[in-house]
Amino acid sequence: MPRRREVPKRDVLPDPKFGSVELTKFMNVLMIDGKKSVAERIVYGALEQIEKKTGKVAIEVFNEAIANAKPIVEVKSRRVGGANYQVPVEVRPSRRLALAMRWVRDAARKRGEKSMDLRLAGELIDASEGRGGALKKREEVHRMAEANKAFSHFRF
């Protein structure tokens, strides 16, 4: 273990439009090459599209989508006696949020709509309604954990 002191967690400021810390974190996940204004434009554009398409409050759809995409368990590799086992472990809350955001972003990037804000809006709507690429990824991770339940006694 390193002997350096523990690095403090940086607090993320809430976004100016909705006052949501999660939304700012999502913008940071979406950001490429430090271009935060581009990420903001995409996210706010997607939220406008969500309100247009669904008629619901956009931030609620966003929060619901992220909540639905959060994994509960995942598998980690553990080496025991020359064999690697996929050991199911519970996911920490901070990692849950990070994984959900990453999966929503990746699923949105893979979609076929014309612009990123339309893709993101579509993915967030799908995730809030219990379908879409991000939820597919979550189910896949849960299936892996379920399949390797027998190795859960090799806890970390």
From Swiss-Prot:
A GO CC term assigned to this protein in UniProt: ribosome
Alphabetized UniProt keyword annotations: Ribonucleoprotein, Ribosomal protein, RNA-binding, rRNA-binding, tRNA-binding
A molecular-function term among this protein's GO annotations: structural constituent of ribosome
Top-level taxon of the source organism: Bacteria
GO BP: any one term: translation
Record keyword Zinc-finger present: no
NCBIfam families: rpsG_bact (TIGR01029)
Subunit structure: Part of the 30S ribosomal subunit. Contacts proteins S9 and S11.
Function: One of the primary rRNA binding proteins, it binds directly to 16S rRNA where it nucleates assembly of the head domain of the 30S subunit. Is located at the subunit interface close to the decoding center, probably blocks exit of the E-site tRNA.
Family stated for the protein in its record: Belongs to the universal ribosomal protein uS7 family.
Name used for this protein in its record: Small ribosomal subunit protein uS7
Record organism: Neisseria meningitidis serogroup B (strain ATCC BAA-335 / MC58)
